């Protein structure tokens, strides 16, 4: 018989930098999960990613105090800001443009995000990324 699920915990943790301090410790502690075990497993799985890149994770907590977790792809906004080499998006996105990315950069981001997007194909994913970029005040050339 399958284990009884007692909840899901969604967190965004910098790659390779999970530690017992908030937000990780309190979120896992409430469910009675082993915090250090999660931190070690998360850091081991995110070694290949760029250190410090915010990585969403969904933790499934079971009644016997065990857990599993699934890593998601980094948020599109983080990848777009990195591609445009800016720190933050525009405060007035449709009037003040703060940067630009090319279609090739948008395609790279779309390929990275593809497992988490609902887009049917790469072209639809590129349009989704372009829309996110536009709402941040970033111009996408060639889309």
From Swiss-Prot:
Source organism, top-level taxon: Bacteria
Post-translational modification summary for this protein: One or more lysine residues are methylated.
CDD domains in UniProt: Ribosomal_L11
Keywords: Methylation, Ribonucleoprotein, Ribosomal protein, RNA-binding, rRNA-binding
GO cellular component, one term: cytosolic large ribosomal subunit
Record SMART domains: RL11
Function: Forms part of the ribosomal stalk which helps the ribosome interact with GTP-bound translation factors.
UniProt family annotation: Belongs to the universal ribosomal protein uL11 family.
Protein name: Large ribosomal subunit protein uL11
Organism, scientific name: Paraburkholderia phytofirmans (strain DSM 17436 / LMG 22146 / PsJN)
Gene: rplK
């Amino acid at each position: 018989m399958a284990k009884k699920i007692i909840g899901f915990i969604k967190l965004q943790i910098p790659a390779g930098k999970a530690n017992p301090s908030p937000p990780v410790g309190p979120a896992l502690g409430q469910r009675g999960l082993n915090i250090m075990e999660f931190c070690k497993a998360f850091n081991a799985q995110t070694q290949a990613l760029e250190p410090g890149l915010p990585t969403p994770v969904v933790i499934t907590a079971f009644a016997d105090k065990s857990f599993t977790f699934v890593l998601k792809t980094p948020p599109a906004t983080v990848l777009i800001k990195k591609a445009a080499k800016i720190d933050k998006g525009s405060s007035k996105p449709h009037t003040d443009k703060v940067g630009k990315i090319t279609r090739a950069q948008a395609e790279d981001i779309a390929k990275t995000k593809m497992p988490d997007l609902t887009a049917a194909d790469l072209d639809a994913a590129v349009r989704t990324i372009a829309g996110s970029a536009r709402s941040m005040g970033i111009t996408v050339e060639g889309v």
